[in-house]
Amino acid sequence: MELKKTLNLIDIFCLASGSMISSGIFILPGIAHSKAGPALFISYFLAGILAMTGAISLAELATAMPKAGGDYFFVTRSLGPAIGTISGVLSWFSITVKSSFALIGMSIFLAKFISFDIVYIALFFCVFFTILNIIGVKEASIFQIVVVIALLSSMIAFVVFGIPHIKKENMLPIAPYGVLSIFSTAGFVFVSYGGLLKVTSVSEEVKNPSKTIPHGLLISLFIVAILYSLMVIVATGILPNHILDKSLTPFNDAATAFGGKLWDFILTISALLAFISTANAGIMSASRYPFALSRDKMIPDIFSKINQKYKTPVFSIIFTGIIMSIFLFLNIELLAKVASSTLILTYILANSTLIVIRESKMMNYKPKFRSPLYPYLQIFGIMGFLFLLFEMGYFVLMLSSLLIVFSLFVYIFYGRIKVNREYALLYLLERITTKNYTNHLLQEELREIIRERDEIEIDRFDKTVEKNKIFDLKGKYTYDQILNLISRETSQNLNIDKNLIKNFILQREKESSTTLSNFVAIPHLILEEPKRFEIFFFRIKDGTEFGDEKDVKMIVLIACSRDERNFHLKSLSAIAQIVSDKKFEKEWLSAKNEKELKEILLLTERKRIKPSI
């Protein structure tokens, strides 16, 4: 069963923003300031720049393959099911932990007003958001829009009203712990951008994903990164260093300093909105990873069951909610560090995935958005992420390694038995070694994804192309040689003597040339048998003489009865649109085999033929 496409640009913007803005900005700045000093705003901005590399890579991948599971789906199709399983588990764990941490943060702030144990408050909201996401993703996203707009408004107000109260002496010296501390602290605060890439996990539910996903992701990242930096500058400029270094509520303290209890209340509400939006977006995004893993047969089928009424993956959502509730009782600080390291690993995989899938040169990889500065942007991102990862320390790396081992265990003892999947790395190996490792299955899957993405209806021309053979000819041919070959190859299928076919083509060519250009010729035959339509495609990579042309690379022979004249004309129009595409000739000549030639004919953009009434 398909997921509903209900999310638009404002939904994606708010989902991305709501996933990012949380404890990373409302709690961490005080601790981070003790590591970097007043230059902390640079650390936040550097972390945002690195996050941009992953966001751009994921935006391209999401426009090529808008499927539930986001980065897990892309990694699996690029690096293989083993690495894909690792990616899915890491991503799910990272978002789930961050969401749990947001619930705890929310409980701490609510404790100002409610005299309940913070864990029980967090549990209540965990159940609430789980139910909200079961009811439907659109209902959850509407809630997200309201929360994020209110949150961003209060953050902007804090900056605008706080700037006049900045004291110069609090900003100096700007880097008391050295320049290197700025970079290491960027790793510490990187979790602040933790929800950004996870928006792609709901890409299958997005309207017009080719534009909506990249625009929503990049606009969200730009606005949030600027707001983070400005808010940190305001808090740093208002609070003395010795106070800010020890504060777990830095913006509340800064707001109280310039605006009293009213501003403290406003910032408390802002923090609560941030935690609410992160928890809600976290359950929505995290639950799509078990769903995607299950749909790929990596984990049991129950995780991919979709509720008939609400069209949401109920068991996957409930399972994620249960695990989040368990995390509420654990050491949140340690889990937050592990979440940060697993998040960085997923960013590394995102950039690596784009490089591999681009270099595989797969015919059906057709993103609507392409990363600028490829591959330099991705290489810069990978190197930067590796630096941040090793800055986090040995213990955190060991815990992340345990998660990787667990993911491999799941794949080896369940997923590997259930499924054998093609992936882009195999296509890249084919390019390097000239050996055959694939059966074109990934290309076919990508074709179906493109059809779903672009809402392409399979028309009669598609069906005709799919059922008929494409002839891939080697060497250069004279006019007589190519006519003999065409006549011989089509004679049996048409049940016509090969000499009659040859003579008919020659006679037709004398009356009027059938070459559409110096690249393609479209001869045709009239069949006496009623209701008959056949089409044969020939690629002559080294060229052939045909009529007056000396170097034709493509011949399309159409054989049809007189009562199929209408479809004959529509097919000619379809072929003309295909061969006039600016990329067609290059793709036609670079295709490796008959299957790739057929994919070009099926997926080159054209108007579809509507069935006759």
Question: Where do the model's predicted regions map?
Answer:
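Hydrophobic transmembrane alpha-helices that form the core helical bundles
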Residues: 31-34, 43, 52-126, 130-134, ...
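Helix-loop-helix junctions that connect adjacent transmembrane segments
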Residues: 1-3, 40-41, 45, 115-117, ...
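Cytosolic covalent-transfer regions centered on His/Cys nucleophiles
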Residues: 416-613
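C-terminal membrane-solvent junction of multi-pass transporters and transport-like membrane proteins
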Residues: 143, 303-312, 347-397
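Membrane-interface "cap" regions at the ends of multi-pass membrane proteins
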Residues: 1-30, 34-39, 45, 51-56, ...
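Loop-to-transmembrane helix boundary motifs in multi-pass membrane proteins
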Residues: 4, 9, 81, 123, ...
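Membrane-interface loop-to-helix entry segments
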Residues: 107, 118-165, 176-179, 217-220, ...
